């Protein structure tokens, strides 16, 4: 039987081996956002903040402009 390979039978016993050192992954590590994604979120937040401040300031600035035009 020197060069022949033994055919694997379907009823052979299979052994499970576990690694001695276990690597643990936290859910936060897996779902952590990349720097490009964090930059996109920051950019979106900044745009929303600008829009909300513009809404507040435009009323005040337009009122002041109208007062100056009346004088």
Swiss-Prot record:
This is Protein DP71L. The lineage of its organism: Viruses, Varidnaviria, Bamfordvirae, Nucleocytoviricota, Pokkesviricetes. Induction: Expressed in the late phase of the viral replicative cycle. Residues 16-18, 57-61 are annotated as: Important for host CHOP inhibition. Keywords: Host-virus interaction, Inhibition of host innate immune response by virus, Inhibition of host interferon signaling pathway by virus, Interferon antiviral system evasion, Late protein, Modulation of host PP1 activity by virus, Viral immunoevasion. Interacts (via C-terminus) with host PPP1CB. It comes from the Viruses. One of its GO terms (biological process) is regulation of primary metabolic process. Pfam families: PP1c_bdg (PF10488). Transmembrane segments: none annotated. It comes from African swine fever virus (isolate Warthog/Namibia/Wart80/1980) (ASFV). Belongs to the asfivirus DP71L family. One of its GO terms (molecular function) is protein serine/threonine phosphatase inhibitor activity. Interacts with the host phosphatase PP1 catalytic subunit (PPP1CB) and recruits it to dephosphorylate EIF2S1/eIF2alpha and therefore restores the host translation that has been shut-down by the host. Also inhibits the EIF2S1/eIF2alpha-ATF4-DDIT3/CHOP pathway.
